Amino acid sequence: MRHFIEPNSFSRNEQLALLDLADRMEANPAPYAHLCDGRILATLFYEPSTRTRLSFESAMLRLGGKTLGFAGAQLSSASKGETVEDTARVVSNYADVIAMRHPKEGAPLRASQYARVPVINAGDGGHAHPSQTMIDLMTIRQRKGRLDHLTIGFCGDLKFGRTVHSLTAALSQFEGNRFVFISPEDLRLPRYVKTESLEPTHQVYTETDDLEAELPHLDVLYMTRIQQERFFNEEEYLRLKGCYQLDEAMLRLAPADMPVLHPLPRIDEISTDVDNDPRAAYFDQVHNGVYIRMAIILALLGIPDPLTGKTVLDHRSEERRVGKECRSRW
């Protein structure tokens, strides 16, 4: 049984096969409409979510399946003290696959060790968000035609930004990429992302606080919000909030074919005057999210693509490498 706990739970070839499956489903959804008849997805969301939870539910419904779950720990037995381990054991009796979001890093990994069905990490604290990473890869490939030999700028909250950590890990598997990490000193990329993702594959990366200086040299810009919910000190959050604000005037410095991605929600880091610029790709990401999550569900359930007769994952293999940082923080 396979789980999707972090991007590298799937090999690079499996990730590419997943992207290809999502492309086929977007182009021709009809053959996939009943592949999950009689199957149930459980969405266990201990933190607030709009896009991730609704797109997972939409994905399962579009495959012919059903959903159940909760949105908020206060609506579950977690409010009574039930552990993640027990919840995973219990819900395994009700569902065929679980998507879990949790504020504590490592919680979905822990759940996967006790569940009897596949577990998808739908975001665990500041650690990882692998399904969002697949959405980001799909969007970049659509816009740039490749996932290698790109200069990718990440801007904003790189310390707590789990989407940044996950996408960095995934893009590190592709040749010739260069990473530019743009943030205030207090929100720099965590050391473990460098030691686990960048350094083993000898990736070239730089760190800076100057977005304007880097814009002319980027192939892709990935913006993130400053995440208030990760701060213990309100004063520190207010000091850093608004440190980067991309608007149409600043975007004139960037290449004409540089897509702007954002995992959403945005606060004030991207002005609404950017929305009508053809480089704005963040609502493309939302659109792609349903098809990627449909593909993830089919892959984990081992359901063959009716157009190719093949499955995405090798279900004979064990779970791939899981980050040491994720383990140690549980």
Describe every region a protein language model picked out.
Residues H34-R141, D268-S271:
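Phosphate/diphosphate ligand-binding glycine-rich loop within oxidoreductases
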Residues V117, E175-N177, L253-P259:
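A short helix->loop->beta-strand "cap" motif at the edges of active sites that frequently abuts
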